[in-house]
Amino acid sequence: MEFLGTTQTASYCGPKKCCGLTSLPAVQAPVIQECYQPYYLPGYRYLNSWRPSLFYKISNVQTCPDESSSTLRPPTTLPALRSALFSRYSPHDWDQSNQLQVRGAEASRLWASRLTDDSVRLLQDKDQLTQQMQQGTTRNLGQRLSDIGFWKSELSYELDRLLTENQNLETVKRRLECAANEVNCPLQVALECLYHREKRIGIDLVHDNVEKNLIREVDLLKCCQQQMRKLAQRIDLQMRDNRDAQHALERDLDDKSSAQCIDEKCFNLRNTSDCISFFHGMEKIDGTISVPETWAKFSNDNIKHSQNMRADSIRLREEAEHLFETLSDQMWRQFTDTNLAFNARISEVTDVKNKLQTQLAKTLQEIFQAENTIMLLERSIMAKEGPLKVAQTRLECRTWRPNVELCRDVPQFKLVNEVFTIDDTLQTLKLRLRETQDMLQLLVMTKCRLEHELAIKANTLCIDKEKCMGMRKTFPCTPRLVGHT
């Protein structure tokens, strides 16, 4: 039997038999402050099964059934002393544990001192950071107000120019409408001239230069009217686009004014202001729909769109002024050409009428002479009948001569020759009488035709000179043709 107190070569210091002990229960992680790291004492003989610590509870050890009871050799030590012998430390472990405690305390104090210094510095840094952030935000709000003011001035300037351009465009539109209505008067005059000239008679219904100029004048006036009205319609559409651009500028300007009021209110807020309060979660809500680039681009696009609309309006106004100048010049030139054609035609008709009157006078003279000639021929024929009767009577009487006295003597020969001569003379005179009568009939017909032609020419002169030229004495002046009333 071995006694207590022997060396470690004793049987109770030999290899420990497996007793089938259950493992320690799992412990819950302790709730400790940040940066705290638990430490443990060194030593392989450290037993958590019986020694309580700061973070573990004493676990109940369930002993396993004695497996050695079945062996023949009894235990060499008492069970009550075995746990006490196994739980003892060496002096080295004790010293090392004390040193660790001291070093742990010094580390804790050093960490606490550093934490205190870091906390002071953190407070100073965070106060300075908060103040700098607030000052920076205030500066940003001021810069934002400056940007808003800049774009407001740009939008206001562009809006004023657009409104002025709209007024100018409205004036040009009214001028176009007035000029188009003013063309109705000369157009009606030209149409009336064409209607009156349709009342010409006979050969005077000619497609002359006057009619060509009148048709060109009507077409030109209608074309001018159509061009003015089309341009007025284009200007009306442009004015709609201008109003859209104007509404966009006004909306943008109103939004900028509202944003400026809000940002001015935010700019003037201080830590001591009465109207400040907590609005938790506002930093997590992103209700923005633009960034500074797109924000500036939006206003810039509105201004560029307005500038494009103004450029289109200026081009339309220049086109309208050019159209006024061109059309008024064309209408005046065509009106003058038509009047010149009228004057030339009236002169031609007057010349022809004078010639016809001259021919009529000569025809009447020829008729008078023909009638005298007929009268002389009739008298001459009647005068030749007496000698013919005498000659024929003489021949008839000489036929009663008896027998050989019926001689073809010189008197007989002369009488026969006289009868033939007088008869031939009568036939010639009668033929000339018929020719003269035919000529007289022709002259009478010519006189009728001349009188008819003179009546036609008089009607033509009345239409062209009195009716048409009477209406064409006046023409709208240039200021009225360009829309100035």
Curated annotation (Swiss-Prot):
Which Pfam families does the entry link to? Answer: Tektin
Which controlled-vocabulary keywords does the entry list? Cell projection, Cilium, Coiled coil, Cytoplasm, Cytoskeleton, Flagellum, Ubl conjugation
Q: Which GO terms describe its cellular component?
A: axonemal A tubule inner sheath; nucleus; sperm flagellum
Single GO BP term = flagellated sperm motility
Coiled coil: is it a keyword of this entry? yes
Q: Where, per UniProt, does this protein localize?
A: Cytoplasm, Cytoskeleton, Flagellum axoneme
- Coiled coil ranges (UniProt) are 113-185, 225-251, 342-385, 423-443
- Carries keyword NAD? no
Q: How is it modified after translation?
A: Ubiquitinated, leading to its degradation. Deubiquitinated by USP16, promoting its stability.
This protein's source sits in the domain of life called Eukaryota
Quaternary structure, from the entry? Microtubule inner protein component of sperm flagellar doublet microtubules. Interacts with TEKT3.
What is its biological role? Sperm-specific microtubule inner protein (MIP) part of the dynein-decorated doublet microtubules (DMTs) in flagellar axoneme. Forms an extensive interaction network in different conformations that reinforces the helix bundle composed by other tektin proteins (TEKT1 to TEKT4) and MIPs to anchor the tektin bundle onto the tubulin wall of A-tubule of the sperm flagellum.
PANTHER family xrefs: TEKTIN (PTHR19960), TEKTIN-5 (PTHR19960:SF23)
Similarity remark: Belongs to the tektin family.
What is the recorded name of this protein? Tektin-5
Q: Per the UniProt entry, what species is this protein from, by scientific name?
A: Macaca fascicularis
